Amino acid sequence: MKYKDLRDFLAQLERQGELKRVAVEIDPHLEMTEICDRLLKAGGPAVLFEKSRGHDIPVLGNLFGTPKRVAMGMGQDSVEALREVGKLLAYLKEPDPPKGLKDAWEKLPVLKQVLNMAPKELSRASCQEIVWEGKDVDLGKLPIQTCWPGDAGPLITWGLTVTKGPHKTRQNLGIYRQQVIAPNKVIMRWLAHRGGALDFRDFTLANPGQPYPIAVALGADPATILGAVTPVPDSLSEYQFAGLLRGAKTEIVKCLTHDLQVPASAEIVLEGYIHPDETAVEGPFGDHTGYYNEQETFPVFTIERITMRRDPIYHSTYTGKPPDEPAILGVALNEVFVPLLQKQFTEIVDFYLPPEGCSYRMAVVSMKKQYAGHAKRIMFGVWSFLRQFMYTKFIIVTDDDVNIRDWKEVIWAITTRVDPARDTLIVENTPIDYLDFASPVSGLGGKMGLDATNKWPGETSREWGKPITMDEVVKARVDGMWTDLDL
C-alpha cells in the first residue's frame, strides 16, 4: 500500500492495530523514552502521545519499532518483500545491459518508472500553512524529547536534513541528530563522510565566508523518511527513490528562507543557515551503542523560520542499548542489502546484521565457497562495497549449510571450523565509528574477520570433518510413525 503523507500512514496503522493513542499527559523529558523503550522491546505498536506536558503538539514515537512497520512504510506487504526493493536498487546501482530485444522490452517499464520519478515542485504546500519567524522562532514550543538522564539537553532525532553541494544537481537527505542549545539554534552532528557534511565542506571551499543554507523536515511521509536511510545509488536522489517506493512523484516545495526544497507534506520544517566558523561542543547523549558518547565539536545551525501544517505532529525517537528503533530499521533494511551484495558477489547466499550488534557493527555472511582463501575475499568485499559497512567491526563468514540467522548454528560453525591463529583476520588503522570508544583513536581502529568455513586444501593439511546427517529415508519413515508413537 502507498501513502501520500505521514497522516495517511498513521490512519492505516491505526486501522490495523499498529498505532495506539495515549490520552494521558506524558512528559517528553525521559517519560516518553521509557514508554517507547518498553513498547519496542515487546514488539508493540507505534504510539501517539496526544498530550505532551507543557506543549500543544502531539508526539509520535516508535513508528518503525517493528520490521513489519518498516516494510509497510516502504509500501511492501512483508519484510520478505523488501528483497524486491533491494533487487531494484541493485539494478539501478549497476544496470545489466539487455541480453536481447525481449530483455530490453521487459526492462523498459523499470527505466520509464525511474525517469518519471523526478520530484514535483508545488507553489504552495501544507507544510507552510503556519509560519514562525523572527522572535516567534522558539524550539522550546516544540515537544522535543530529552531521552536519557545524562543527556546534555533536548535532542531532535528524526529530522530529515536537506543539503546541496555547489557542484551537484540534486539535493541530499540525511538524518543527523541535533542538540538544542538556544531557541533558534541546534548543533548539527554529522560525521565527515556523510552526505550533508560533504556538501557543507564543498560549499565552504567554493564560497568562503558565506552562510550555508540548511532545512530540516520533521514528519515527512514514510517513503521519504526511509529513503533517507536506504543505500540509494549516487545517481538517484532520495526524492526519486521515495517516488519509486510510493508509486507517485514526491511533492516538494521551495523553502521561504532559501532555495532548498523540502517534502511538501512534512509536519514541521526548520529553515536557516550554518554560519562560517560557528561551532559548539555537542553531547554527551545516550546513543545506539547503549553508552553515553564523548563530546565533540560540530557546526551550529541557526533557524530563521519554522513552518508547519495546521495541528502538526512531532515525530521523535530515542537511541539506546539495542534493540532500539535504529536496530529494528537495520533488521528490515538487512533484506534490502542482501540483493545488493549478491549482485556484486554472486557466491553470497545470505547476509545478516544481528540487531544486538548496534545495527552494523557485526555482520554474518554465508557463501558457496569455491577456493582456498575465498572467505577473506568476501570479508574485504563487504567492508568496501557499501558506505554502510565501512564501520562494521566484525565479519563472520560461513558455508551455505549454516543458517546464519540462528546463533546456535553460527556458534557451532565457529567452534568447529575455526582455528584462531589461521582463521582470524585482523586489519588495523581502519575507519571506525566516532562513537566507538573501544577504538584506541577516535574514528580509527581495527576490524576482525572470522573464517568459519570448511577448509580447503592449502588451508589445512588434515582430513576435514564430515558433518553428521541422518539418512533421508529413515527420517521420512520416522515422520510417518511419529504420531503413533505418542511421544
Curated annotation (Swiss-Prot):
Pathway: Cofactor biosynthesis; ubiquinone biosynthesis
Localization in the cell: Cell membrane
SUPFAM superfamilies with a match to the protein in the record: FMN-binding split barrel, UbiD C-terminal domain-like
Chief location: membrane
GO cellular component, as recorded: cytosol; plasma membrane
Cofactor binding note: Binds 1 prenylated FMN per subunit.
Xref: Pfam families: UbiD, UbiD_C, UbiD_N
Any Gene Ontology biological process: ubiquinone biosynthetic process
Residues reported to bind prenylated FMN: 175-177, 189-191, 194-195
UniProt keyword Membrane, yes or no: yes
Record's signal peptide: none
UniProt keywords, alphabetically: Cell membrane, Decarboxylase, Flavoprotein, FMN, Lyase, Manganese, Membrane, Metal-binding, Ubiquinone biosynthesis
Active site: 287
The protein's Enzyme Commission number: 4.1.1.98
Complex formation: Homohexamer.
Family, similarity comment: Belongs to the UbiD family.
Name of the protein in question: 3-octaprenyl-4-hydroxybenzoate carboxy-lyase
UniProt organism field: Nitrosospira multiformis (strain ATCC 25196 / NCIMB 11849 / C 71)
